[in-house]
Swiss-Prot record:
Disulfide bonds: 19-26
Post-translational modification: Highly phosphorylated.
Organism: Human papillomavirus type 41
Motif (Nuclear localization signal): 2-10, 533-540
Record-given protein name: Minor capsid protein L2
Quaternary structure and interacting proteins, as annotated: Interacts with major capsid protein L1. Interacts with E2; this interaction inhibits E2 transcriptional activity but not the DNA replication function E2. Interacts with host GADD45GIP1. Interacts with host HSPA8; this interaction is required for L2 nuclear translocation. Interacts with host importins KPNB2 and KPNB3. Forms a complex with importin alpha2-beta1 heterodimers via interaction with the importin alpha2 adapter. Interacts with host DYNLT1; this interaction is essential for virus intracellular transport during entry.
InterPro entries from the UniProt entry: Late_L2
Family statement drawn from the similarity comment of this UniProt entry: Belongs to the papillomaviridae L2 protein family.
A cellular component annotation (GO) from this entry: host cell Golgi apparatus
Function: Minor protein of the capsid that localizes along the inner surface of the virion, within the central cavities beneath the L1 pentamers. Plays a role in capsid stabilization through interaction with the major capsid protein L1. Once the virion enters the host cell, L2 escorts the genomic DNA into the nucleus by promoting escape from the endosomal compartments and traffic through the host Golgi network.
Location within or outside the cell: Virion; Host nucleus; Host early endosome; Host Golgi apparatus
GO biological process, alphabetically ordered: microtubule-dependent intracellular transport of viral material towards nucleus; symbiont entry into host cell; viral penetration into host nucleus
Length: 554
């Protein structure tokens, strides 16, 4: 069920008009408000009979504060213009003002006693009183009495005005005439200046300090006056003679600086901006390489053709001139315009470039020919490229020398030395060491051939490695592989020179730590694969609810 929508009450003014028009019932507050029968209206209606508030505007909301009488304030007097000279006019009292006017007596003022002036202070100058025009226009009243008479009399002061037609020059009466300044004339201006001298900060005129000039109040510098030395120990500096019209160069250069040709610090004219570098490697330019050396200085010879018809001797020089014309570069023959040379620094060297415009292959009706743009260049300084083949010279390696291989016997017996290189160690063992005879002349085995040692050196008197090689006598049966393990050093002898001997021994129990191969030309070693730790795969097992293993994946 939907809630009833609340209907807003109509405006009281609309309710009152509807009720009066239709004759229906209206709310009592609406009727009292528009018929002014509220208690407040009744109080104002009956209270205004006995009390009169005038035009104060109580209850109107204006707040004007009363009614203005006339053009000015209540009881006010219009201002009198200062232009007319004579007695003041008697103004009538306005009828709208208050009926009772209270007269306030004025007390006479004593004459002003001048204050004593301080001799140490400047005297005060009083400016003359100047009557200036009013800021606002005043109301001018007509004079009701003639200026010749003085009707105004307050009983205390007598003012007598003598008409202008009477002559008072010889009556023995002194009349003082006061001249009033004109309204437009502001009068003379007075400027005062006061100076105080403090004797505490006075500087003596005579001083012994060289170059002191602040001691005197006035300094006069003249071209014809002689110089005066201030102080005893003064350094004399030669000065130039100054004359009118001469220009003195006051340029001061620091030590080590040189004078330049510039006269002013600011340039007198705007410098010309340098042109932007050309970009001749765009798609709109055809790249043409020119090999003729005349392209560098006299490129016009490669473009223009000489006409042999105008020569004097045609029969003798026609063929030669024609050959000379045909000698022109074919790439520059149809060029219509050629720019100035540009020098560029490339990775291959110094390059001279010129931008050219070929003759138009397409012409319009107006005579305009459209041609292609080309970039002509020539490399004059190839860098990194040999002009002529140079024979290669074999150079010795600096700071490197071959190693020394020494065969040292175990017991104190004479040793056998053989100089070999470290890089060709395997080849030396096969080719040179096998030629050593280890048997005596009687055919018996020599004891000196056993327990030999190989000592390898880098050439800097530093022993790299020493290993003992037990060599068997007879033929090519010599050790090939050394296997070091916990049980000692195992030597594997090859049974055949053709078959390949495995590096790993046949017994799986003998697992070597390091395998050394003397015939590979290197002394590096590798860890046996059996010693490397293998990565185990994590097995996933499936369990039942009772905890038993269901199966093991392979």
């Amino acid at each position: 069920m939907l809630a009833r929508q609340r209907v807003k009450r109509a405006n009281p003014e609309q309710l009152y008009k509807t009720c009066k028009a239709t004759g229906g019932d209206c709310p009592p507050d609406v009727i009292k408000r528009y018929e002014q029968t509220t208690p407040a209206d009744s109080i104002l209606k009956y209270g205004s009979v006995g009390v009169f508030f005038g035009g104060l505007g109580i209850g109107t909301g204006r707040g004007g504060g009363g009614t203005v009488l006339g053009a000015g304030a209540v009881g006010g007097r219009p201002s009198i213009s200062s232009g007319a000279i004579g007695p003041r006019d008697i103004l009538p009292i306005e009828s709208g003002g208050p009926s009772l006017a209270e007269e306030i007596p004025l007390l006479p003022m004593a004459p002003r006693v001048p204050r004593p002036t301080d001799p140490f202070r400047p005297s005060v100058l009083e400016e003359p009183f100047i009557i200036r025009p009013p800021e606002r226009p005043n109301i001018l009243h007509e004079q009701r009495f003639p200026t010749d008479a003085a009707p105004f009399d307050n009983g205390n002061t007598e003012i007598t005005t003598i008409p202008s037609q009477y002559d008072v020059s010889g009556g023995g009466v002194d009349i003082q005439i006061i001249e009033l300044p004109s309204v437009n004339d502001p009068g003379p201006s007075v400027v005062t200046r006061t100076q105080y001298n403090n004797p505490t900060f006075e500087v003596e005129v005579s001083t012994d300090i060289s170059g002191e000039t602040s001691s005197t109040d006035n300094i006069i510098v003249g071209a014809e006056s002689g110089g005066t030395s201030v102080g005893d120990n003064a350094e004399l500096i030669p000065l130039l003679d100054i004359s009118r019209g001469d220009t003195i160069d006051t340029t001061i250069l620091a030590p080590g600086e040189e004078e330049t040709a510039f006269v002013t610090s600011t340039p007198e004219r705007v410098p010309i901006q340098e042109r932007l570098p050309i970009r001749p490697y765009g798609r709109q330019y055809q790249q043409v390489r020119v090999t003729d050396p005349e392209f560098l200085d006299s490129a016009a010879v490669l473009v223009s053709l000489e006409n042999p018809v105008f020569d004097a001797d045609i029969t003798l020089t026609f063929e030669d001139d024609l050959q000379q014309a045909l000698r022109s570069d074919t790439d520059l023959r149809d060029v219509r315009r050629l720019s100035r040379p540009y020098y560029q620094r490339r990775t291959t060297g110094l390059r001279v470039s010129r931008l050219g415009q070929r003759r138009g292959t397409i012409s319009t009706r107006s005579g305009v020919q459209v041609g292609s743009a080309a970039h002509f260049f020539q490399d004059i300084s190839p860098i990194g490229q040999a002009i002529e083949p140079i024979d290669a010279i074999e150079l010795d390696v600096l700071g490197e020398q071959s190693g020394e291989g020494t065969i040292v016997r175990g017991d104190p017996t004479p040793s056998i030395e053989q100089d070999i290189g470290l890089t060709a160690l395997g080849d030396n063992i096969e080719n040179e060491l096998q030629e050593i005879d280890l048997l005596t002349a009687d055919g018996e085995e020599d004891q000196e051939g056993r327990d030999l040692q190989l000592v390898f050196s880098t050439g800097n008197d530093e022993v790299v490695d020493i290993m003992t090689i037990p060599i068997r006598a007879g033929g090519d049966d010599r050790p090939s592989v050394f296997i070091f393990s916990d049980d000692g050093t195992h030597i594997v002898y090859p049974t055949s020179t053709t078959a390949t001997t495995p590096l790993v021994p046949a017994q799986p129990s003998d697992v070597p730590y390091i395998v050394v191969d003397l015939y590979s030309g290197s002394m590096d070693y590798d860890i046996h694969p059996s010693l490397l730790r293998r990565k185990r795969k994590k097995r996933k097992r499936v369990y039942f609810s009772d905890g038993r293993v269901a199966s093991r994946p392979k």
